[in-house]
Amino acid sequence: MYLSAGLRKIMDNPPVTSKYQHRSQDEMLSANLNHQQTTNGSPSTTMMLGGDAAAVAFASSSSNGAGDAYFRGLAALTGNASGISSMDMSNSTETGIVAPGHTETTVAVIIVYCVLFIIAAGGNLSVVITLFRSRRHRRSRVSLMICHLAVADLMVAFIMIPLEVGWRITVQWHAGNVACKVFLFMRAFCLYLSSNVLVCVSLDRCFAVIYPLRVSAARKRGKIMLGGAWFIAFANAIPQSIIFRVQHHPNVPDFTQCVTFGFFTTPAMETAYNLFCVVAMYFMPLMVISAAYTVILCEISNRSREKETSDTSHTGGMRLRCNDLTHIERARQRTLRLTITIVVVFVWCWTPYVVMTLWYMFDRESALKVDGAIQDGLFLMAVSNSCMNPLVYGSYAMKCRRPWRRQMAPNGVQTPNAAQRRSTDAVSGMVGPHSDRLTGRDNKDELVYEGGGTERNKLKQFGMANGIFARIGSTGRNHVTMAGGGAAGTSVATTRFGNCTTTVGGRNVTEPIRTVAMSSGSRVKSFQPSYSEFVMMADERSLMLSRPSFYSDPTPNEFDSTVDCGLTRSLDTGGWR
């Protein structure tokens, strides 16, 4: 795997057998002069270190060539950023150094790397800039995680790809021992980080589906997961700075290379480290991601069966008339599709190279028969994952903007449906909620609303014959009084998802959950336009907080159905029962 340490070999090395294990490094290096290069391909180099051009081959006619098979293969898939071999080495009948040459394949690979750099750098920079410029995206958990994933992809673009290109051009390492350790550490770090952030995204979506109303806890949990992703990536990449170092060729003192040569005393040790890297970067994240989305699919399936058994919901005496497939559910599904697509792209890009890596680890002889150009292509496909993510984001954003534009009036004013989409996007996690929040207590009489400033309004709860209603005591524009009459026919138009039809001022009005109206018979008992509205949810434990941006007709006792309440936030109020 490209996170494996690998061994960028300076020359064809003999197999590490007992007769070599006790020799000094110089003796082992010199022993290569007696081994023959059996193919025109270069000795392979390791993924973690860069292109094949870093290797210098030695050729001789005095050996059967069996000795170079181990290291030529080891430099291939276990760590090579560019595959087993792409440099042509001319066969020689005399013992000596054969300098690598830049073939058409090498030039083509460099060109592809440059194209990938342009796409990855431009696309991910656009994603980061867009997210930082949008206030609502800065408040979103999903957007925050996508931003971290874009940062990891930018590190691939600005660290890994230039390192690959430069190494292929210069062949040897010119930057010194400190740079060798730092760059190889950073190269592994950004790749670990990318897979770890995908795990965070999947777990966040899993918790969002299972606990849709625990918004405050979800934001804190998301930040903790992202911090853990960075820490784990850092810890996993530390060995790279230990095992890699600059070494000089014993027979060509001016030739230096950043290698792990001589660090692993046996092939088993190197294989174990390479296997650890494959598991930590690919298989372990993939297992967690698969488990998370399995839970999500099971939860969605269970909810679908519940909807089939009941077209309407009942809680106590409150009858809720809602759409079967609600806008908030659609918003969550859009977010879920986005995250699943990102994971599928990751698996699609990396799986072929991982399979080839494992193939080499357990059957080197047959793996070495694979054409070097194919191996180069497999790794380029893996690196292209950093280019694919911005394309996924862009495609998703375009699909979301088309219906939004259709819902705009000719004069540019947002229609109620468009406002509703913004509200449901907030609940789905794609748009951040406002700063207002409710602090839940075990005692429902002690629920406190903390507004945008220092104001704290105590929310009193009282029960009626067929429902629970809320009374919010405050002054000025924040004043809302809602009361109902039990047997007199009072109804509360609230639900967790979708639109609700209510009777307001003698007429039927269909509004999304961002609005609330209480009626007694055919008239509104008491309703004043407020800056903040609270909606009692069907589970009698949670409230919905809406922050309206304007009211078109703020008359005291009439609810205007054209009101735009802006973004909506779901809140879990704790231990109500």
Swiss-Prot record:
This is Adipokinetic hormone/corazonin-related peptide receptor variant I. Highly expressed in abdominal ganglia, and also observed in the carcass, accessory reproductive tissue, testes, head, hindgut, and thoracic ganglia of adult mosquitoes. Is more expressed in adult males than in females. It is found in: Membrane. Residues 412-421 have a biased composition (Polar residues). Residues 434-446 have a biased composition (Basic and acidic residues). Pfam families: 7tm_1 (PF00001). Residues 1-108, 163-181, 245-275, 363-377 are extracellular. The keyword Disulfide bond applies. Disulfide bonds join C180-C258. Residues 130-141, 203-223, 297-341 are cytoplasmic. Belongs to the G-protein coupled receptor 1 family. It comes from Aedes aegypti (Yellowfever mosquito). CDD domains: 7tmA_AKHR (cd15382). InterPro entries: GPCR_Rhodpsn, GPCR_Rhodpsn_7TM.
